Amino acid sequence: MLLGGSVSCDSYEILHEQIHGWLHRKNISASIRRVSTLPVAIATDIGLVRKENQDRVAVLKFRPASKSKDMVVVALADGMGGMEGGGNAASLTLSTFFTEVVRHSYLSVRECLEKAILKANDAVLKIYKGNGGSTLTAVVLDGSEYITTANVGDSRIYGLTNDGIVQLSEDDTLAALAKKYNNIDFEASEFDSRFGGELVQFIGIDSVLQIHFFDITAPQGGAVLLSSDGAHTIGDNNLNKLFMHSSNTGLYAKRIIDLASWFGGFDNASVAVVEVEGILKDLDVSSGYVINVWDPFGELKLVNLPQTLSNHNENQASSADGKQSEKNKVQGGVVKKTAVKKKTRSRNSNAKNIEKKELNKNEELENISQLDMSFSERNSVKGDKNER
């Protein structure tokens, strides 16, 4: 499949269909892996109660046609339990989001994310008519001065350093609104019992969508964590303690999933752990003509022919998106900036050497999903026995 400036909308539809089908394939109930060539770990677990894993977590890496560095997008979607087609809604959210990021990658990161998130909202709304939906949390790294994050729903983004843990995202729940606007100093769990943890907005909602944007700098010596509510239910304090006592991203991700199971495993639990500084150093290593997508269970590679998008194709896409997107315009945004400078390192090697290095990294970084099987995977008696 070739994607580029002279491509038709059909090529992006094919890209979307392939990513969606791959994300929605049947998998075992739990897996954890370190993403080859990137200092990222992703993990998911069905838990001990749910019959279906409606979480999706994945990483996208490709070289935008108009830019000199690769773009890495880490995203997590949590299909809404109890609503129609939660698992498919999450798959549709991520596949649409990734496709639109590739399509609009020539724009600024925030403009690109805005278009991609609104398109994902339209896609889920079209299928489920407001009766199904998903959260969406994403982190984008492209070598810019700041790292851009975005979220809709109650999946979270945390910044982690030796100094502690900071929530960078904003929860779209009744509990969070009550705490924000009533200035009452209670823990989130107390708010949930008083006001409920219902989402006030999500991907697939039939109303104005407010996307929460955050700009951060690289947490020196730290990491960024994306988590579904089934994972961060263990509490910020425990998330921080586990980080302080974990030697790498894979071990940290595994321990979060395991502790969520020890807490009862009442919901699906998924995380992505990102060593930002390590990724920033590798953005000069080109993905070439390949779009890479990873989830906790495997890797997908798609051919991409990078060219500058033509105004003609952009106008076609804009007119097609315009009707529904106007209804779901973004209102506002939030910006947070930490005071830590990021470091970048230039690379000066030819294409063949780069390819060899990437192959070597692929061989060195093995999937640890089978070696580090989670607590719930070892002890749960639910599900298809053939999956174990």
Regions found by a protein language model. Give the residues of each.
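PP2C/PPM-type serine/threonine phosphatase catalytic domain
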Residues: 1-388
